[in-house]
Amino acid sequence: MISMAGFEHEPERAWDEYDWERFLQQQDHKTEKYMELLEKYLDDPNRDQIIAREMGWTQLLEGKDWTQEVDALLEEDGAEERAEPPDSFEEHSLYRAAFALTVWIDQMFDADATLQNEPSAVKLATHAALASAKLAAALSGEDVDEIGMTIAYLKRALKAITLSIDGAAALLRERRISVAQHAVLLQRLFQVRDGIITLIGEYRGEWRRRFGSR
């Protein structure tokens, strides 16, 4: 569950893709800050209190026992998960194509272990996996009010797959993969990229149909 605390918006207006992008950027910043603090104070006996103070998590500093509330929330989340259709995003053809791409790249790494130390290969693999994860996030919800969120995640998936394309081109320039391997990579990468672009257009059209051009 994503916390929207501290993010101001118009309560009566559905968020569009730009509202969601701003929100996701804020979450990225908070995650980066948390990871930096965790690394800095990893061995400090007062680590949790220090991080809570730095992150502004005042409820954790008040000494309140949140165990029962957390357990209740987990039970609610579990009930919601059981009520939802299983693996809905995994059935989407675009997600399957993105996942198949990551499997193909893994197999290429298995065939040539030296690629694992190549920055261009790491860029290719990392961003292909990231694109797959962003697609999973985009395709997991069918809520009308979350069309903007879906588009925002699709745009992030598009950025990731574009960086993977750059990584593939660099590997060819560096002669770390063959022309034939690059051709297969491009076919798979562009299949995912074009699918993302098509989906963004479809969701934007649905947004305009439901909410107008605002």
Predicted features along the sequence, with ranges:
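Amphipathic alpha-helical assembly/interaction segments
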Residues: 2-214
